[in-house]
Amino acid sequence: MGNIIAPDYIIKIVQQINENVVFTAPSMSQRAAIFALQHRDEVQPPMIEEYRKRMFYAAERINEIPKISVIYPPKGSFYLFINIKETGLSSVDAADMILREAHVLTLPGNAFGECGEGYVRIACTVNVDTLKEAFDRIEKVMKEQ
């Protein structure tokens, strides 16, 4: 989701590109999905292990940072909901601060409903080295907050 200020002809082009990206999977992606489904016994275990490694690293690291925490051990997907209540910030303000000062994108928990207030969501879809850098930045921001 986003906004664009541009002449009408550019907006129409951007809209067409966006619709193709969002609503239709390119044939190359469809073929990759078919291959992955047909070979899931080979493809899935290393992917599961890699995401498990990322999630456990992220959860352990978050719980070492002042004023934030996460339920441990993580279960399920590659998203973590980080408890930011101790910061005294709203989830929107916390997500904004983390983006502005740490240059790490999170989503405010209240985007997922009222019960998400007091949390931000982070995706652990990048490698552990990138996660380490992100959490180093977040830790610095939290210590200064």
Which residues are covered by each model-predicted region?
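Conserved core segment of the aminotransferase class I/II
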Residues: 1-52, 61, 142
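Short hydrophobic/aromatic beta-strand micro-patches
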Residues: 3-5, 81-83, 123-125
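A short linear hydrophobic-aromatic micro-motif
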Residues: 59, 67-71, 105-110
